C-alpha cells in the first residue's frame, strides 16, 4: 500500500521536474538574475529623471506598451519587445552626453538578462494594454514587476 503512494510521489516529482517546475536552486538563480535587471532598470530611470526639462518633455512624448497583466517571468517577452524603442528614445536624448556608453551597457545587460530569465519559450505572445505609457511610467512599471517577482521568490 505504501509502495503505491511512494511510486505516485516519485512520478509526481519527475513530472514536475520534467515540466520545469521551479526548484530551490533555480529560485536562487532567478533571484541572482533579477537583481542586476532591477539595478539596470533603476539606473535607466535615474538617467531619464536627470535630463534637462526640455529633453525630458521630448522623451515623454514617446509612448510605450505595457502588457495587460504582467505576473510571470514569461511576461518579460513584452519588455524585450519594447527594448529597441526604449533604446532609441534614450539615444535621442543622450546624443551629446557621455553617459551613452553606460546606457548602452545597461540596455545590453537588460537584453541578456531578460533572454535568460524568460527562457526559450517562443510561443508566448504579449497581450498589450490599450493605453500607452511614458518612458518614466514604463520603467517604473517594469521595476515594480521585478520587485514583485523577487519578493515571491523569497
Curated annotation (Swiss-Prot):
Signal peptide: 1-20
Subcellular location: Secreted
GO MF annotations, alphabetized: cytokine activity; growth factor activity; interleukin-2 receptor binding
SUPFAM superfamilies per UniProt: 4-helical cytokines
Carbohydrate-modified residues: 23, 111
Keywords: Adaptive immunity, Cytokine, Disulfide bond, Glycoprotein, Growth factor, Immunity, Secreted, Signal
A GO term from the CC aspect: extracellular space
Location, primary (coarse class): secreted
GO BP term, pick one: adaptive immune response
Top-level taxon: Eukaryota
Disulphide connectivity of cysteines: 78-126
Protein family (similarity comment): Belongs to the IL-2 family.
Reported function: Cytokine produced by activated CD4-positive helper T-cells and to a lesser extend activated CD8-positive T-cells and natural killer (NK) cells that plays pivotal roles in the immune response and tolerance. Binds to a receptor complex composed of either the high-affinity trimeric IL-2R (IL2RA/CD25, IL2RB/CD122 and IL2RG/CD132) or the low-affinity dimeric IL-2R (IL2RB and IL2RG). Interaction with the receptor leads to oligomerization and conformation changes in the IL-2R subunits resulting in downstream signaling starting with phosphorylation of JAK1 and JAK3.
Annotated protein name in UniProt: Interleukin-2
Organism per entry: Camelus bactrianus (Bactrian camel)
Gene transcribed to yield this protein: IL2
Amino acid at each position: 500500500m505504501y509502495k503505491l503512494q511512494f511510486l505516485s510521489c516519485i512520478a509526481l516529482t519527475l513530472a514536475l521536474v520534467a515540466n520545469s517546475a521551479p526548484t530551490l536552486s533555480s529560485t536562487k538563480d532567478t533571484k541572482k538574475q533579477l537583481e542586476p535587471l532591477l539595478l539596470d532598470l533603476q539606473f535607466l530611470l535615474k538617467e531619464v529623471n536627470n535630463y534637462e526639462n526640455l529633453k525630458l518633455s521630448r522623451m515623454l512624448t514617446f509612448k510605450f506598451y505595457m502588457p495587460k497583466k504582467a505576473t510571470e517571468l514569461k511576461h518579460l517577452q513584452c519588455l524585450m519587445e519594447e527594448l529597441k524603442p526604449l533604446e532609441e528614445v534614450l539615444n535621442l536624448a543622450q546624443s551629446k552626453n557621455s553617459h551613452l556608453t553606460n546606457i548602452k551597457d545597461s540596455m545590453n545587460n537588460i537584453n541578456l538578462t531578460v533572454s535568460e530569465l524568460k527562457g526559450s519559450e517562443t510561443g508566448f505572445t504579449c497581450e498589450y494594454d490599450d493605453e500607452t505609457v511614458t518612458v518614466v511610467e514604463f520603467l517604473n512599471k517594469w521595476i515594480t514587476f521585478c520587485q514583485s517577482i523577487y519578493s515571491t521568490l523569497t
